[in-house]
From Swiss-Prot:
InterPro entries the UniProt entry points to: Antp_homeobox (IPR050296), HD (IPR001356), HD_metazoa (IPR020479), Homeobox_antennapedia (IPR017995), Homeobox_Antennapedia_CS (IPR001827), Homeodomain-like_sf (IPR009057)
Protein name: Homeobox protein Hox-A7
Listed GO biological process terms: anterior/posterior pattern specification
Cited function: Sequence-specific transcription factor which is part of a developmental regulatory system that provides cells with specific positional identities on the anterior-posterior axis.
Principal subcellular localization: nucleus
A GO CC term attached to the entry: nucleus
Keywords, ordered alphabetically: Developmental protein, DNA-binding, Homeobox, Nucleus, Transcription, Transcription regulation
DNA-binding region(s), chain positions: 130-189
Motif Antp-type hexapeptide boundaries: 119-124
Length: 230
């Protein structure tokens, strides 16, 4: 056999198959304008006849927005909560304005309370422009400082720190006290001349030194005030 025999035979088969598909009926998915399937019958025709009526814009169903089946009319919307909310808007606005007024009154009360607030001396700020008050020493602090001054009129930095920790004072306060005490001592001994001797180192404080400490605690020291103002 030659190859042309097989080619002619296959061609004849495919030609016969094509004729079979040409005689086949169209499937149900193809919608012809006037074709009806025998399986569906009159039901399909009835549905096709009702479709234009359902989607007709001139139908009474689309003319009235309130369907009779729901039992609602045009006046039924007056009873909805939206209408009552619209009617209550002025009242709500008045309540908001009243609340704002109450807050303003509350702020005025707070302002009056702050104006009447009492400020104590210890609550004030100690800025550089503020004049420092006069430092006062207790009886015990004055006595210990007088004892220290009796032994030595000038303190070293180390001894000043020790005395500050022992007497709960600052170094500046102790330095100011000793400076004022030295000025007072010079005024007391200026008539004695340059031969006035200082208290010997290691001497025990006498009753006169204790009495001087008590007197210094009671009287006002003008020189101390001048030093603190500087």
């Amino acid at each position: 056999m030659s190859s042309s025999y097989y080619v002619n035979a296959l061609f004849s088969k495919y030609t016969a198959g094509a004729s079979l598909f040409q005689n086949a009926e169209p499937t149900s998915c193809s919608f012809a304008p006037n074709s009806q399937r025998s399986g569906y019958g009159a039901g399909a025709g009835a549905f096709a006849s009702t479709v234009p009526g359902l989607y007709n814009v001139n139908s009474p169903l689309y003319q009235s927005p309130f369907a009779s089946g729901y039992g609602l009319g045009a006046d039924a919307y007056g009873n909805l909560p939206c209408a009552s909310y619209d009617q209550n808007i002025p009242g709500l606005c008045s309540d908001l304005a009243k609340g704002a007024c109450d807050k303003a009154d509350e702020g005025a009360l707070h302002g009056a309370a702050e104006a009447n607030f009492r400020i104590y001396p210890w609550m004030r700020s100690s800025g550089p422009d503020r004049k420092r008050g006069r430092q006062t020493y207790t009886r015990y602090q004055t006595l210990e400082l007088e004892k220290e001054f009796h032994f030595n009129r000038y303190l070293t930095r180390r001894r000043r720190i020790e005395x500050x920790h022992a007497l709960c004072l600052t170094e500046r306060q102790i330095x100011x006290w000793f400076q004022n005490r030295r000025m007072k001592w010079k005024k007391e001994h200026k008539d004695d001349g340059p031969t006035a001797a200082a208290a010997p180192e290691g001497a025990v404080p006498s009753a006169a030194a204790t009495a001087a400490a008590d007197k210094a605690d009671e009287e006002d020291d003008d020189e101390q005030e001048e030093d603190e103002e500087e």
